[in-house]
């Protein structure tokens, strides 16, 4: 039944996107992307699905380095991604998230300056956090970020020099992700 329900949902969504009417009902379809080691807590199970309505976001990110993301990493990474998308992509901006809460957000003349300002907002909570940058990570930014333990870094790209700096931290996860898109919906289920 899940196969036909998936197919029907795709058809419904196509008609909905191509209509000016507001529907009373909304259906969604997704494909299993990965089964996670555990859910929010170790005794819970969790899975990650890719939505038929989106082509960007954490499920579509490329993991360049590090181990598989956990459920909590995904939640925090998504919070960081949503926050950083609120800022102008032309102005270097960095957001640091811990337990789904911002502990630093700043813009600057350079990405390195933006990171330094964001980190200075709460140097304690930033430890083990998720960092989202709205521009390609450069060598100077990487040299600053590497100074503290970080779980995940999300950015639209990374230079070869920055990659080399991060390689010394094998558990650091680096996600390359489209930040500014016009996907049809943002879907969540708790």
Where is each model-derived feature located?
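Single conserved hydrophobic/aromatic residue that forms the stacking wall/gate
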Residues: 180-190
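Active-site loops and adjacent core secondary-structure elements that bind or stabilize anionic groups
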Residues: 1-182
């Amino acid at each position: 039944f899940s196969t036909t329900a998936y197919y029907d949902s795709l058809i419904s969504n196509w008609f909905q996107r191509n209509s000016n009417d507001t529907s009373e009902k909304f259906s969604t379809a997704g494909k299993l992307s990965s089964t996670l080691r555990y859910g929010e807590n170790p005794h819970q199970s969790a899975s990650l699905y890719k939505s038929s309505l989106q082509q960007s976001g954490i499920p579509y990110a490329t993991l360049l380095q590090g181990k598989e993301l956990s459920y909590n990493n995904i939640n925090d990474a998504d919070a960081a991604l949503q926050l950083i998308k609120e800022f102008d992509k032309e102005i270097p901006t960095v957001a640091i998230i811990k337990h789904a809460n911002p502990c630093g957000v700043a813009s600057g003349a350079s990405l390195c300056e933006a990171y330094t300002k964001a980190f200075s907002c709460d140097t304690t909570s930033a430890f083990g956090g998720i960092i989202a940058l709205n521009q390609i990570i450069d060598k100077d930014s990487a040299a600053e970020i590497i100074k503290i333990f970080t779980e995940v870094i999300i950015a639209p790209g990374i230079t070869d020099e920055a990659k080399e700096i991060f390689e010394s931290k094998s558990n650091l996860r680096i996600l390359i992700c489209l930040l500014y898109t016009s996907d049809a919906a943002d879907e969540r289920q708790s």
